Regions:
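N-terminal active-site beta-alpha-beta segment that forms phosphate/nucleotide-binding
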Residues: 2-82
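Short, charged beta->alpha transition segments
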Residues: 14-15, 86-87, 104
């Protein structure tokens, strides 16, 4: 099978792709402009089927549908590696958790 045929055989719609997500899973969204809005919307549509799904993003400009559709955080918890302005506002509302990505040595006294 050539690469293009193999690639086409693996293509899925966002709704088909998020069927793989189970309770308790971690899902990683990509960073910034690579944010997957169609996948995010498809995952948000499964809100009532899922519990304790944790999602990590990074510099997402917003909106993040899994956060907006579940302000009680009964189904999804959203974490960010580095806050965009939108994610900082989510943090201020208690709807986003910051994951410390980088630590550097602190000066000794």
């Amino acid at each position: 099978m050539d690469f293009q045929a193999e690639y086409r055989s693996k293509l899925r719609t966002p709704a088909e792709a998020v069927r793989a997500v189970k309770n308790g899973d971690w899902v990683d969204y990509t960073s910034g402009l690579g944010f997957p809005p169609l996948l995010d919307a498809a995952l948000a549509a499964r809100r009532d089927e899922l519990h304790d799904v944790k999602v990590r993003g990074n510099l997402c400009a917003g909106p993040v549908q899994i956060v907006e559709c579940d302000p009680e955080q009964a189904h999804f918890l959203y974490h960010t590696w580095h806050c965009s302005a939108y994610e900082r506002r989510l943090c201020d509302r208690g709807l986003c958790y910051f994951c410390l990505l980088y630590t550097s040595p602190s000066p000794r006294d």
